[in-house]
Amino acid sequence: MQARISFIASLGFLALSLIGVQTAFATEAASNCGIPSDAHDGWAISSPEEQALNSTLLCTMGDGISEGKLANVDDIVVVRHGVLVYERYYPQKQLHTDATTLHRGYSMTKSVVSLLVGIAVDRGWINDLDVPIVSYFPENADLRMPDKAPITLRHLLTMSAKLGSSETPGVSFAYSNGETELVGAVLQKATGKTVDVLAQENLFAPLGITDVEWLKDPFSGIAQSARGLILRPRDWAKIGQLVLNRGVWEGKQIVPASWVVKSTAEQIKTEGPRSAEHIKAEGPDSYGYQWWLGRSLDKDRRVEWIAAMGFNSQKTIIIPALDMVVVFNASRQSKNMVAPELDLLDRYILPAARN
């Protein structure tokens, strides 16, 4: 009888020990989930808690994505207070992704081109955004159209040039890849360099971005200004942090602060007049110089953000009020979801930063 009691007690002790181990493991897993490794690429690293972020919410989000319950994303990178705090990758069946994987940004490229225009203005390569762009192409004077002569670089930057339309430039927004390609052509005329070379010398090198690809136009062989840039997710985050810092990286002014402020401020509405009820809605509703501006709602808190956006839910989101940058990359769309990455932002990332 005594031996039986001793055996039962031993089983109880073993069970309690296992529960303790499992609890400790779960706690450790939650605290370590998504914490980046130091790649010696210019990023300081810490846990989410050290930067006042709730790691449990971030891990819940990450696990939901891994289990196929949430949006289809390839990676999420979160930076707060200039420190990389969360980084998680989700390999797909035919696509391996990790911290070294280059990811095409599609139209996020446009926002990088805007930074190049700011650098060109600062260096005196471009003197005036309101000069008609035909002045950059005197060799094509015979192709000028009287109704399009007033188009300026400012019109192109705000997607209001109305190329291929009889509408007056500068009045309303109409998204166009062609307008950003023209911005790239103006940059090449003004600087003598294509956007990829200009970016490497004046933007990527100072940021310590070394692994870069840039898709070329199949006919001209020139780098695509509208949607050709391919970077690591961590490097897309550097672009976001540069903007959050008003053009400064590691104490050096790379892009003029005045340009960053102006280019990420509302220059034109992307929608018509909004009702009082509509104003409460989430998502992008205005445009700067190749940057989107929008908002999210975290319970009663309205959070304004700036974003570079690309096809298939590519987003680099800058949240000044929370001193935070969030990068999403994806290679396939999420079913029945219009903006899956914004859903993740609203349900998990913003609440994680609530305190």
List the model feature ranges, each with a label:
Residues 5-7, 13-97, 119-127, 158, ...:
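N-terminal leader/targeting segments and the immediately adjacent pre-domain N-terminus
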Residues 70-73, 101, 311-313:
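Short, small/polar residue-rich loop motifs at catalytic or cofactor-binding pockets
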Residues 211, 264-325:
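Active-site Gly/Thr loop motif
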Residues 27-30, 308-355:
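Structured C-terminal helix/loop/strand segments within mature extracytoplasmic catalytic/sensor domains
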Residues 104, 123-163, 193-227, 231, ...:
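Active-site helix/loop module of the DD-peptidase/beta-lactamase fold
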Residues 59, 82, 89-90, 101-129, ...:
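Active-site SXXK
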Residues 54, 124-129, 187-200, 247-256:
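Structural helix-adjacent loops and short alpha-helical linkers that scaffold large soluble proteins
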Residues 179-186, 229-249, 314-330:
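Active-site-proximal alpha-helical segments within enzyme catalytic domains
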